C-alpha cells in the first residue's frame, strides 16, 4: 500500500501506525490481541476499498506493510495454525473473496504457518459496523461453528479491523469450547470501538 508513494504520502501513512502493537483492551475468550494500524485516514480508506471494491492493490503490498509486526508476534508466541475470521458463504456471491481469509493465506505462506479453516460462519448476519454494542452481541449468537479438531492447538486468528471485539470474542469462545489451548488475535487495524 505504501509502494510508489511520494514522501509526504508515505509519511501520512506512517502516522497511522500504532505505537504499541499490543491492544490493551481485553476481549472475552481472547488471550492476547495485536493490531498494526489505527483505523483512520488512508488505512481506513484502503481497507474499505479492499473489502468492497478493489482488493488487489491492498493485498499486493499487504505483507510489506506488516511483515515486521508478524515476525514480532511469532517471536512472542508459538502457533499451531493461523485462521481467518470467517465470512458467510453468501458474501462470496457479492465479492467473490474474503479479505481476512486472503490476509491469513498470505501470512501463512510467507511465514510457513499451517493455515486451516476450522471455523465456519453458519448464519447470515447483519453487518456489524452498522449496529450498537448490544445489537452486535445478539447478531452473532449461533453464527459460528467449529468443524475441525483443534484440541490443544494454539491459534492465531486474523481479522481486518477490530473495535468492540465482538466478532473475535465469539469466534474465540467457539474455539475454546472445542478445546483450543490459546487464541491470539491480530488485526490489520484497530478502531477503539467506533467501527466494526
Identify the meaning behind each predicted range.
Residues 1-196:
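Glycine-rich phosphate/pyrophosphate-handling loop used in enzymes and phosphotransfer proteins
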Amino acid at each position: 500500500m505504501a509502494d510508489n508513494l511520494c514522501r509526504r504520502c508515505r509519511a501520512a501513512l506512517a502516522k497511522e501506525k500504532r505505537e504499541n502493537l499490543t491492544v490493551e483492551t481485553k476481549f472475552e475468550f481472547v488471550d492476547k490481541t495485536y493490531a498494526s494500524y489505527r483505523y483512520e485516514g488512508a488505512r481506513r480508506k484502503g481497507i474499505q476499498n479492499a473489502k468492497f471494491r478493489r482488493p488487489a492493490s491492498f493485498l499486493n503490498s499487504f505483507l510489506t506493510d506488516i511483515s515486521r509486526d508478524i515476525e514480532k508476534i511469532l517471536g512472542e508466541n508459538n502457533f499451531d495454525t493461523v485462521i481467518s475470521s470467517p465470512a458467510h458463504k453468501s458474501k462470496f456471491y457479492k465479492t467473490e473473496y474474503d479479505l481476512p481469509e486472503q490476509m491469513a493465506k498470505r501470512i501463512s505462506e510467507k511465514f510457513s504457518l499451517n493455515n486451516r479453516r476450522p471455523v465456519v460462519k453458519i448464519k447470515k448476519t447483519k453487518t456489524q459496523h452498522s449496529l450498537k454494542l448490544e445489537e452486535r452481541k445478539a447478531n452473532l449468537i449461533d453464527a459460528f461453528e467449529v468443524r475441525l479438531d483443534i484440541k490443544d492447538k494454539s491459534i492465531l486468528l486474523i481479522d481486518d479491523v477490530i473495535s468492540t471485539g465482538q466478532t473475535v470474542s465469539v469466534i474465540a469462545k467457539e474455539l475454546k469450547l472445542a478445546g483450543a489451548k490459546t487464541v491470539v488475535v491480530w488485526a490489520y487495524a484497530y478502531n477503539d470501538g467506533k467501527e466494526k
